[in-house]
């Protein structure tokens, strides 16, 4: 089509082109199947932008991915769903983030929120501080890569000197990552948690942003970050400073 090759399925496309990454924009009803098609094709990485995939669909595809890996099959990393993607400035962008706000540098950014990722990156760039890689994890309750996974990658990355880790209410991921950082992280981390004023039981934007217990609150997560040696800000306008 207009000089662009079209293939019947992901496996055929990967075989013909050598592609190793799939980015999924498929509507929610078919997105989990699209993720699994990429996993079956043994791609290295799947990035799912789609928001609103049924939880049951994501549970099923996650179960199949784990079963495949347990049986000795190739492991495929999943970023998302409901994420903006990933960017290494001046090298590669896979997703929907505005590329012009990024500047190549040595600060990593990881966040559950796409817009807060953009805000942190824009602040850094305005201050003349570049980014090594910015990763949007996505805000759905069932997802792939988590904060702890990306923090481990940044810790091992020779091109990253410091990290901004942004989270939000709901779930244990940020606290687990902070505790891992206390034991293993060799680089300074700035932390921010959105949702300080969020009432319990009310979803705030993302499907996964829901306080279901005391440890899920922004205050509790910020306290854990401080205990683990993070430089914490309570104001999103100060994430880059």
Q: For each predicted feature, which ranges?
A:
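Catalytic-core regions of core metabolic enzymes
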Residues: 1-241
């Amino acid at each position: 089509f207009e000089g662009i090759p079209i293939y019947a399925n992901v496996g055929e496309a990967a075989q013909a082109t050598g592609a190793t990454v799939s980015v999924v924009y498929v509507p929610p009803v078919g997105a989990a199947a699209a993720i699994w098609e990429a996993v079956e094709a043994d791609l290295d990485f799947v990035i799912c932008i789609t928001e609103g995939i049924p939880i049951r669909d994501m549970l099923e595809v996650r179960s199949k991915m784990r079963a495949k890996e347990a049986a000795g099959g190739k492991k495929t990393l999943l970023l998302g769903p409901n994420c903006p993607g990933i960017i290494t400035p001046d090298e590669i962008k896979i997703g929907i983030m505005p590329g012009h706000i990024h500047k190549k540098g040595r600060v990593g950014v990881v966040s559950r929120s796409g817009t807060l990722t953009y805000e942190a990156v824009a602040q850094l760039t305005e201050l003349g501080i570049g980014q090594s890689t910015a990763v949007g994890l996505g805000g759905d309750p069932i997802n792939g890569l988590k904060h702890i996974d990306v923090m481990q990658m940044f810790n091992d990355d020779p091109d990253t000197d410091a990290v901004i880790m942004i989270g939000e209410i709901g779930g244990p991921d940020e606290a687990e990552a902070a505790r891992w950082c206390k034991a293993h992280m060799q680089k300074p981390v700035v932390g921010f948690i959105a949702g300080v004023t969020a009432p319990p039981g009310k979803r705030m934007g993302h499907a996964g942003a829901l306080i279901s217990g005391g440890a899920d609150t922004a205050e509790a997560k910020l306290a854990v970050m401080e205990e683990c040696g993070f430089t914490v800000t309570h104001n999103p306008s100060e994430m880059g400073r």
